[in-house]
Amino acid sequence: MSKKIIVNRRSVLKYGGAASVALATPYFFTRGALAAGENYRNAPKGDTVTFGFNVPQTGAYADEGADELRAYELAVEHINAGGGGMLDTFTSKALTGGVNGKKVTFVTGDTQTKSDAARASAKRMIENDGAIMITGGSSSGVAIAVQGLCQEAGVIFMAGLTHSNDTTGKDRRANGFRHFFNTEMTGAALAPVLENNYGRDRKVYHLTADYTWGWSQEGSIQKYTEPMGWETVAAVRTPVGAGDFSQYITPILNSGADTLVLNHYGKDMVNSLTQAVQFGLRDKQVNGKDFVIVVPLYSRLMVQGAGDAAKGIFGSTNWHWSLQDEGSKAFVKAFGEKYGFPPSQAAHTTYCQAILYADACQRAGTFRPSEVGKALEDFDFDGLGNGPTTYRAGDHQCFKDVLVVKGKENPSSKFDLLEVVEVTPRAKVEYPADMLGGELGPYNDGEA
């Protein structure tokens, strides 16, 4: 069984690596618990309902995982209170305190940024802790694995930070939903900015994380930059958590490439970017051009780790704490008051997913996955920091504006590290629901 502790700011930081955490409650859920007339997996019958937060508490993406846990705790506080943060700016006003008359508690697991560990962790939360929904993660490999498990188990999966096209493409599932954007959107938004700043006809070297997200990101960048004459001279796969990337960077020096695209994330991006700059790549001239580096998927946490190496480097992001819409300001204020620093995009997307799930349950009047899913499908909303957004029914992918950013040359603080250079309208990153392959299939409500 999972250990339950009283959660506050100190305990979240102290127990960030714990196997599971829950808000203090006298009621413990058992597998297959039922409410009257509710015959679906883990239907709650007491006065509480349990969410399962599955995040990387160890491994290369642990910084994102820690921020996700902070955001989830804040979201649970706001859901139970019926207000606070972006719940006050959210266009849906269904949540007024708890969900369907029940207080939300939660348990957590460590994905370790490994698919097998993530599935095992999610399975424990579903079977041992009665989790009605699983959410979280910072790896697309993990997301796809856990999404498949949740489909089999009959619970909803609200994906965390997952950027591979496959999550809502060929590996989409009816029980899975993604708020975060994907590599297709990154390519569409980022390529015009790269052309405007670096021109056409460049020789490109890709270093790519060797799993579904890296492959997807590499492919999307190639798709949108090759028409402007950006030719791939090499695409080299690197293991997640490599640490030392020198053996992968050395061959770039004599490759004839004048552009390096780092399809890395988390500590891997911090290490590979820092080492590429230390090797002098940004000081080189090749083919009569200044050598440039591109990081397609950025986060403030990564830039914080990379320091000066990230200055002036372009990328994309799902959200940034400097946005001035009412939702973003409310979230930054609430998160900052609780933790003392601004939230990351990982924190933002996971907070949104918790709110969106709770709201859908409230609007549906049940926690039954098929009914909750229908409440999310083609749901139009605003007030959660990304502008007008739609949860498309065809693939369970959110569509919203995309931010193109670059590392600030003269940051005013250790958090003021990214500059938003363009907000790409949602219409420019939309695509047909069947373009990326895959089928949702039927909902699974699970066995009671």
Q: Where do the model's predicted regions map?
A:
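N-terminal export signals
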Residues: 2-5, 11-35
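C-terminal segment of N-terminal export signals and the immediately downstream linker at the start
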Residues: 28-54
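Extracytoplasmic ligand/sensor domains, especially the bilobed periplasmic-binding protein
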Residues: 39-40, 70, 116, 128-236, ...
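Short beta-strand segments enriched in small/hydrophobic residues
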Residues: 48-67, 204-207
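Signal peptide-proximal N-terminal region
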Residues: 70-105
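Short, well-structured alpha-helical segments in soluble
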Residues: 108, 112-130, 196, 246-256
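Extracellular/periplasmic ligand-binding modules, especially the Venus flytrap/periplasmic-binding
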Residues: 266-269, 321-379
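Solvent-exposed, acidic/polar segments of extracytosolic/periplasmic ligand-binding ectodomains
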Residues: 380-448
